[in-house]
């Protein structure tokens, strides 16, 4: 295990981020996910300067992993952390094939963007990467898939992975308001009134993980197919899992 410039936890809510949370504390194979090292979030473009100050100085944040596409980043920006001396790693997993439902969309990410996701996992094992935060726009779909990959490789039970995914539901009212603005800024067609607003439900992630087991035998099988070595997976676990 390596040592990091980890500091005290962030107390209270952040000003601009509505879907930021620590993945630490979840049950994992051989212990729990180590707190204070890996976070997920909605877009850090919404962070205020005060948020950036807290993330850097309270959490000792070292790396931002951005799952948005190049056009999103160009149009919406990176926010105040882009000039805060924090490392930046671009891992775009947008632009996957259309699917009939969200589960199909998530599986498409795992297949079509598997190499990008695998490189991102590898980057987490590099010295100096942690503590890290990863995000997309809402912090739900793309972020939820990467969270499922990492947590699955750490041996977090599927029910706990699904519960973490579903925790985004509390932030959906604020996220949906933002999405309407983002859609307009990116020149995309608005959501038709006939299309219902969805919420992340645990059952969606449970089904996704079932399909991972059916296709790859589990997340480790997915990782092997995408070039991650046993040593890299061991390093990931050594860094991110602490004995119970």
Language-model features: where?
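Cys-dependent protein tyrosine phosphatase-like superfamily
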Residues: 1-133, 145-244
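Ser/Thr-glycine-rich phosphate-binding loops at phosphate-binding pockets of nucleotides
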Residues: 138, 142-143
């Amino acid at each position: 295990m390596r040592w990091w410039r980890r500091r005290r936890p962030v107390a209270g809510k952040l000003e601009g981020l509505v879907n930021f949370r620590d993945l630490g504390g979840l049950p994992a194979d051989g212990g729990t996910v180590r707190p204070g090292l890996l976070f997920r979030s909605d877009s850090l473009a919404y962070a205020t300067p005060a948020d950036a100050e807290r993330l850097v100085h309270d959490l000792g944040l070292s790396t931002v992993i951005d799952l948005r596409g190049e056009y999103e980043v160009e149009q919406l920006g990176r926010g105040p952390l882009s000039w805060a001396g924090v490392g930046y790693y671009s891992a775009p997993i947008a632009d996957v094939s259309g699917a009939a439902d969200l589960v199909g969309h998530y599986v498409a990410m795992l297949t079509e963007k598997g190499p990008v996701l695998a490189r991102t996992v590898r980057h987490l094992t590099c010295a100096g990467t942690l503590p890290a935060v990863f995000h997309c726009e809402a912090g739900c779909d793309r972020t939820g898939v990467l969270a499922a990959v990492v947590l699955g490789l750490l041996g977090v039970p599927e029910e706990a992975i699904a519960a973490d995914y579903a925790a985004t539901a509390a932030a959906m009212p604020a996220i949906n308001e933002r999405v309407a603005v983002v859609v307009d800024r990116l020149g995309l067609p608005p959501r038709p009134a006939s299309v219902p607003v969805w919420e992340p439900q645990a059952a969606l992630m449970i089904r996704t993980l079932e399909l991972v087991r059916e296709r790859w035998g589990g997340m480790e099988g997915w990782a092997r197919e995408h070039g991650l070595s046993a040593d890299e997976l061991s390093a990931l676990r050594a860094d991110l899992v602490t004995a119970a």
